Amino acid sequence: MLETATVEPGTPAMLAGFDHARLGHDHHIVFPDLTLRISQGERIALLGRSGVGKSTLLDALRAQLGDQGAWCPQANALVPVLSAYHNIYMGRLAHFSRWQNLINLLRPNRACWQEISALAETLGLDGLLRRQVDQLSGGQQQRVAIARALYQKRPVFIGDEPVASVDPRQGARLLELINERHHTCVVALHQRELALAHFDRIIGLDDGRIIIDAPAHELTPNDLDVLYAPD
Ligand SMILES: Nc1ncnc2c1ncn2[C@@H]1O[C@H](COP(=O)(O)OP(=O)(O)OP(=O)(O)O)[C@@H](O)[C@H]1O
C-alpha cells in the first residue's frame, strides 16, 4: 500500500513507502501496522535484533522498487558452484539476451570481463574471479555479493547485512564504496558504529514496530542500546 501524500515543492521525491501496512509471511505477521516513507537520496540503516523483521521489510521494499533496486542479499545467496565472475555477471542477466548469457557461461564476454575485473579490483577481489565461490572465504563471498549488486547499476542499493562477515575497517571501506555509487541506500546492519558513521537516517525496529527513526547525527551508540536490550 503506497502513501499518496502531497509532496511539497523542494521535498525529495518519495521512492517507496507504507501506509498502515501489514507485512509478514503467510500466517506470520511481522509488522501489523507499518507506516514509513523513503525518499530519493536518503541513506538509511535498518537496525534491530535478529528476527525483528529487517529482511521482511527489505523484501517489501524490493517488491515496491522493482528494477530500481540493486539487491545485495546475505552472502549465502550466491551460486556456490559458479565462479566469482559468473556470480557477479548474474547481476545483469536480464540485461543480456539468453544467447549472450549462455555463451558467456562458457567463454566470458571480453567487455563484461573487463568491467567486472575493474569492479572486483575496487573490492579487493583481484585474482579471484575464476575461483568457484564455495572456495572463497566468507568475507570474499560477501564482497562478491556486493559486487553483483553494484554491477546491476540500479539507482537504489538494498542490502541485507552486506558487511556482516568482514572486519569493521573493511566494512567501513565497503560501505563507502556502496555510498559512492548509490545516492539512495537502505541497508540492514548489526554494527551500530558503522550505521551511525555511514548513513544519514537510522531506523530501529523492535516488536513489530519502528521504535527509532532519527537522523544519524542526532544519535549516539548508547541511544541504540534499546534495540538490543534483552527481553
Ligand atoms: N519465509 C518465512 N515464513 C514465515 N516466517 C518467516 C519467514 N521468514 C522469516 N520469518 C519470520 O519473520 C520474522 C522476521 O524475520 P526476518 O528474517 O525479517 O528478521 P531479521 O531481522 O532480518 O533477522 P536476521 O537479523 O536474523 O537476518 C522472524 O520471526 C522470522 O522467524
Please state what every model-predicted region is.
Residues R209-D231:
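Conserved beta-strand-loop-alpha-helix hinge in the C-terminal portion
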Residues F157-D160:
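Catalytic Walker B motif of ABC-type/P-loop ATPase nucleotide-binding domains
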Residues L189-H190:
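H-loop/switch region of ABC-family ATPase nucleotide-binding domains
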Residues I146:
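Hydrophobic anchor residue at the start of the ABC signature
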Residues Q132-L136, Q140:
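Conserved ABC ATPase signature
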Residues L82-I103:
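Q-loop/switch helix immediately C-terminal to the Walker
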Residues L102-L128:
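Conserved ABC ATPase "signature" region
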